[in-house]
C-alpha cells in the first residue's frame, strides 16, 4: 500500500557539496539526549557511562561529508588515566512515524549535523578538544571541562578477565548471553519494539541483527561512500531500544547475500556503479575497496561505538 503526504521543508538525503570558509562553531553538549547544564563554575558534571553527544556546525569545502579524506571531525579526549582520539560523523535527522501500522521515517531539518558521540567510561576529570581537518586546513576548539562521577551502570560488555570464554561487564558482573537472531529490521507494526520487549520479558539479553542492503545496511546507494541516513536512523532507534531493555547486540556488518545474484548487480562496490570490483571476490583483495570499507568502519565506530551493549 502506498501513502503520499506533505513534506515539511526541503529534504536533502543526497550529498550536497559544501563551499564555505572553514569553521567549527556553535557546539552544544547533550547528555543522554538532554541538553547539558553546566554548574556555576562552568564545569559539566555527568555520571560514568552516560552518553555524551556534541552537536555543531562545520563549514569548509567538500563534495562528500561522509568521506574523511575530504573533511574529518575528531575529538581528542583526555580522561583521568589516558588520552585518545575519537571520530566524529555527519548525519541527517529523521522522525519515526506510523501509517496504518507501517513504520516510516520522515526526514527532518537537521540543525548542527556534525556530531561527536561517546561514552564517559572513567570517573574523574575529562576534557575534549575538537579538530576538523579540511584539505590542508584545520581548526581546533577546546571545550568546557567535564567531571565524571561514579554511577551504578554496569558499563561495556567485554570478554571476561577471569575466563575469556565468557563475558563480563566493566563493573565485574558476569553475563551469560541468551537470545536469537533478528536478521531483518521489520517495519510492519511496532517491530522491533514489540519483539524486543517480548524477548526481554522472557529473560533474553542478546540478539543478532544484520546490516544488509534490505535492512540496516547504510552503504547501498549509487556509489561507494554514500550512507543511507534513514537506515542509520533506524539503527539509532534499535540501539537505544535494546540498551533500554538490557539487550546486548551482535551487529552483523555484512552478509554474503549482498554479493550474489541481483544484489551483486546492485552493490555499490560493483564496478558498474563506480565501485572497485569486477567480481565479488575482488571486494576482499582490492586495495581501493579495502580503503573505502575502512571509511565505513570509521563511520560505524563514530556513530554507534558509544553503545555499551
Give names to the regions the model predicted.
Residues 72, 133-135, 151-309:
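Active-site mouth of glycoside hydrolases
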Residues 18-44:
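Short, compositionally biased P/S/T/A/G/V-rich stretches that sit at domain boundaries
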Residues 65-72:
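Short coil-to-beta strand junction motifs in C2/discoidin
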Residues 74-76:
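Beta-strand signatures of extracellular beta-sandwich domains
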Residues 1-14:
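Extracellular beta-strand ligand-recognition surfaces/modules
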Residues 54-65:
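Short amphipathic, basic-aromatic surface patches that mediate peripheral association
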Amino acid at each position: 500500500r502506498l501513502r503520499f503526504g506533505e513534506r515539511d521543508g526541503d529534504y536533502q538525503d543526497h550529498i550536497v557539496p559544501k563551499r564555505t570558509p572553514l569553521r567549527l562553531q556553535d557546539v552544544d553538549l547533550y547528555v543522554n539526549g538532554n541538553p547539558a547544564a553546566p554548574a556555576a563554575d562552568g564545569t559539566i558534571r555527568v555520571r560514568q557511562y552516560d552518553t555524551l553527544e556534541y552537536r555543531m556546525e562545520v563549514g569548509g569545502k567538500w563534495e562528500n561529508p561522509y568521506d574523511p579524506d575530504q573533511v574529518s571531525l575528531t575529538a581528542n579526549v583526555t580522561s583521568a588515566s589516558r588520552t585518545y582520539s575519537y571520530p566524529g560523523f555527519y548525519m541527517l535527522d529523521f522522525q519515526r512515524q506510523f501509517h496504518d501500522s507501517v513504520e516510516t521515517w520522515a526526514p527532518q531539518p537537521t540543525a548542527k549535523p556534525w556530531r561527536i558521540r561517546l561514552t564517559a567510561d572513567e570517573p574523574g576529570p575529562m576534557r575534549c578538544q575538537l579538530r576538523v581537518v579540511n584539505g590542508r586546513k584545520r581548526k581546533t576548539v577546546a571545550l568546557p571541562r567535564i567531571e565524571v562521577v561514579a554511577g551504578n551502570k554496569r558499563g561495556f560488555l567485554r570478554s571476561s578477565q577471569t575466563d575469556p570464554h565468557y563475558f563480563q561487564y566493566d563493573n565485574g558482573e558476569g553475563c551469560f548471553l541468551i537470545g536469537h537472531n533478528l536478521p531483518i529490521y521489520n517495519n510492519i507494526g511496532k517491530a522491533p519494539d514489540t519483539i524486543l520487549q517480548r524477548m526481554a520479558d522472557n529473560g533474553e539479553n542478546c540478539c543478532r541483527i544484520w546490516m544488509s542492503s534490505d535492512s540496516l545496511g547504510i552503504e547501498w546507494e549509487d556509489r561507494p561512500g554514500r550512507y543511507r541516513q534513514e537506515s542509520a536512523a533506524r539503527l539509532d532507534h534499535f540501539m537505544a531500544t535494546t540498551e533500554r531493555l538490557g539487550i546486548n547486540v551482535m551487529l552483523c556488518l555484512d552478509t554474503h547475500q549482498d554479493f550474489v545474484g541481483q544484489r551483486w548487480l546492485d552493490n555499490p562496490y560493483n564496478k558498474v556503479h563506480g565501485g572497485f570490483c569486477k567480481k565479488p571476490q575482488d571486494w576482499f583483495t582490492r586495495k581501493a575497496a579495502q580503503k573505502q570499507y575502512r571509511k565505513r568502519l570509521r563511520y560505524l565506530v563514530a556513530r554507534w561505538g558509544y553503545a555499551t551493549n
